[in-house]
Amino acid sequence: VEQLVALFESFRPDIVMNLALPYQDLTIMEACLRTGVNYLDTANYEPKDEAHFEYSWQWAYKDRFEKAGLTAILGCGFDPGVTGVYTAYAAKHHFDEIHYLDIVDCNAGDHHKAFATNFNPEINIREITQRGKYFEDGEWKETDPLSVHKALNYPNVGPKESYLMYHEELESL
């Protein structure tokens, strides 16, 4: 934290846009609080030694940011982030009610490699090895990793096998 505080004090930014791996979120948020800098990130906090993410660790900073007159905006990447904006827009402008919502993501590029990810490989592996989670009939349900899947036909990509995963949208929508 101290090195970030020194860096922020030397540059005096209005906002820090955290694009680092999610292990650093709390450290960067703490440095922002100590230096009076607003905060924005693209992915929620996850401990480095455990494949487990949830926003509660970052939400615990809410009162401190408010008391300091600072803003902290969480999950402003594509998913979560853009997916939440699309969902809110659709709910406001296109539907009276939404009873079912799937947020799907397709990585169609493989760069001619057997294993290619659209984000940090370690984080992707941690995501796909966690239990799946979804909300149905008023309750949360869990599945074994990658056990629920179906082929989806993606525009401009074609059919791809797609898997139910627990992802940050379930924490942020």
Question: Where in the sequence are the language-model features?
Answer:
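Residue-level detector of anion-binding/catalytic polar loops
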Residues: D14, N38, T71
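Rossmann-fold NAD(P)-binding glycine/threonine-rich loop
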Residues: T42-T71
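Active-site-lining helix/loop region of Rossmann-like oxidoreductase modules
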Residues: K92-L173
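Conserved Rossmann-fold cofactor-binding substructure of NAD(P)-dependent oxidoreductases
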Residues: V1-P13, A20, Q24
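Adenosine-phosphate binding glycine-rich loop
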Residues: Y61-A108
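Redox-cofactor binding/interface segments in oxidoreductases and associated redox assembly factors
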Residues: V16-N18, D41
